[in-house]
Amino acid sequence: VSTCMKFFPDKRGLIGGITTAIYGLGSVILPPIVTEIVAATDAAAAFKIVGIAFLVIICGCSFFMEQCPADFVPDGWTPPTAAAGNQVENKNWKEMLKTPVFYVMLLLFTCGAFSGMMVISQASAVATNMVGMTAIVASTAVSVLAVFNAAGRILAGLLSDWIGRINTLSVASVLGVVGLLLLYMTGQGGYVTFYLGIAGIGLSFGSFMGVYPGFTADQFGAKNNSVNYGIMFIGLAGAGYFGPSAMRKIYMTEGTYHGAFLVACAFGLAGFVLTFVYRFFAKKKA
């Protein structure tokens, strides 16, 4: 992801969105392939076959990758920060951790990704228990979520190049809350509100995934973005742990998912507030 963005500094949002969308589609493409392999052999053999295939593909593709030259600038493009006399400083991970804005961005990532990680983990179960879908029909919910997740990464990345990263994340936070409220209002047979809800959550989650690589590079420089974004990814890991855990515990306690949607709404609103906290630090820096 970071290598691609270095070659396209004028389109960091779009390129970050496309690359994250492509690796996100792996969760859609791989399962049916693995299912066929397991059916033909067994689980242990499937792990070996997939592992060897990945090793060959990844190592093979690595021969075609090139390191981006230092201070690379596409023809005809002038870096806006340099033109404004406000050049972004390339910070390493230690310097990044010393800045207050890093922790704001980390918490924003967790809050923004919370609803997506929560619903992705239980999308099929929600469709079955809340809407009354059959297991076969409920499986389409996962596919719909994956499609809007991938679309959100590309569309939000492109949008962030036009209106700015933080403005795009503000919109994504609101969209996620709207999606959660639609799920909260969903009952038996509520196909329309259910699919609209997971579509909104998919777009919101995809937006955070697509925008954050460029967002991190914009804030701390592109030179060390591979490491810096890897550390920033801890925010997603937090959402990946607390989101599904909260949903399972609430369902086990209450026998319904509605309380989990309200908890996720609180995180989404907190994320929206954090976008203004980020703006405060950004203005202070300027």
Model-inferred region functions:
Residues 1-21:
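Cytoplasmic helix-loop-helix junction between adjacent transmembrane helices
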Residues 23-70:
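Helix-loop-helix hairpin linking two adjacent transmembrane segments in secondary transporters
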Residues 32-41, 46, 127-128, 159-160, ...:
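Interfacial helix-cap and linker-helix signal at transmembrane-aqueous boundaries
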Residues 162-173:
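Cytoplasmic membrane-interface "Motif A"-like loop-to-helix N-cap segments
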Residues 175-188:
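C-terminal ends and interior cores of transmembrane alpha-helices
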